[in-house]
């Protein structure tokens, strides 16, 4: 814009030569003044652009030279402001006599003993149906496979699933057999070898006629070592199982191992 204005003023001065010297001086003074302003504006623009370029270079250099800080956190995660390695606070390690496992941090120890040889029980603060128990019993078996298949082993320790308390004439709704008020279904079983030791993993869904919790999901992990049968049973009610308890029960059961 500044150069265009100067061109118009110069043309006007040339086409009016009959004006006085003072008038020509005035005319020639204005374009000079305009040019001067235009130069100042250009200088300001150049200075602003230069500063922006310099700032961009600094930001780019900082981005290239920076490293991801331990305090950085993705969306939805808590920032580790002190820069130390984060640990899993959802579980607490438990080292027992000959075994170890991870216990949900919000579960409390319980003195209740349901089964023979039970040495540990932790339960959910808000729902005792969600719990984990560890049993240690003497045995003449050398390996867990000496009990037969996982299903055969379960039949020998079916007390873990809870005995039917009612015996009499009844026809319960919900698909139960005549005179039966409880049923257990094996959902899955496996026989992994961990650390050179054979284990049995059995997932069972038990239901009772009273419909309490819609049934219980019970995960049983067992192995034999040095003349002892080690059993870990973690469970949760069916409703809470699908509301988040499943993760804690599965993680606890899978963490169990003999030392």
Curated annotation (Swiss-Prot):
Keywords, comma-separated and alphabetical: Chloroplast, Membrane, Photosynthesis, Photosystem II, Plastid, Thylakoid, Transit peptide
Gene3D superfamilies recorded: Mog1/PsbP, alpha/beta/alpha sandwich
Induction: By light.
UniProt GO cellular component terms: chloroplast thylakoid membrane; extrinsic component of membrane; photosystem II oxygen evolving complex
Annotated transit peptide: 1-73
GO annotation (BP), single: photosynthesis
Origin: domain of life: Eukaryota
Subcellular localization(s) per the UniProt record: Plastid, Chloroplast thylakoid membrane
Predominant subcellular localization, coarse grouping: plastid
GO terms assigned for molecular function: calcium ion binding
Function: May be involved in the regulation of photosystem II.
Family according to the record: Belongs to the PsbP family.
Protein name per its UniProtKB record: Oxygen-evolving enhancer protein 2, chloroplastic
Organism of provenance: Pisum sativum
Gene that this polypeptide is encoded by: PSBP
């Amino acid at each position: 814009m500044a150069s265009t204005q100067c061109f118009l003023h110069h043309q006007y001065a040339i086409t009016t030569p009959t004006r006085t010297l003072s008038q020509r001086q005035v005319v020639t003074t204005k374009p000079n003044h305009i040019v001067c302003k235009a130069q100042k504006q250009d200088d300001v623009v150049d200075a602003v652009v230069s500063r922006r370029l310099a700032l961009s270079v600094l930001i780019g250099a900082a981005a290239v030279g920076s490293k991801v800080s331990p305090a950085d956190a993705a969306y939805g995660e808590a920032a580790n402001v002190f820069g130390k390695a984060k640990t899993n606070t959802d579980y607490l390690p438990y080292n027992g006599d000959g075994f170890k496992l991870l216990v949900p941090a919000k579960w409390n120890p319980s003195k209740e003993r349901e089964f023979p040889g039970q040495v540990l029980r932790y339960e959910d603060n808000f729902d005792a149906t969600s719990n984990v128990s560890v049993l240690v019993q003497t045995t003449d078996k050398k390996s867990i496979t000496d009990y037969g298949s996982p299903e055969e082993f379960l039949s020998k320790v079916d007390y873990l699933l809870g005995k039917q308390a009612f015996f009499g004439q009844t026809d319960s709704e919900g698909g139960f057999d005549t005179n039966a008020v409880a049923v257990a279904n094996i959902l899955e079983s496996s026989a992994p070898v961990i650390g050179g030791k054979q284990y049995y993993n059995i997932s069972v869904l038990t239901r009772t006629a009273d419909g309490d919790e819609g049934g219980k999901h019970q995960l049983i992990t067992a192995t034999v070592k040095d003349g002892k049968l080690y059993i870990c049973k973690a469970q949760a009610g069916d409703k809470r199982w699908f509301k988040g308890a499943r993760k804690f029960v599965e993680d606890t059961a899978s963490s169990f191992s003999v030392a």
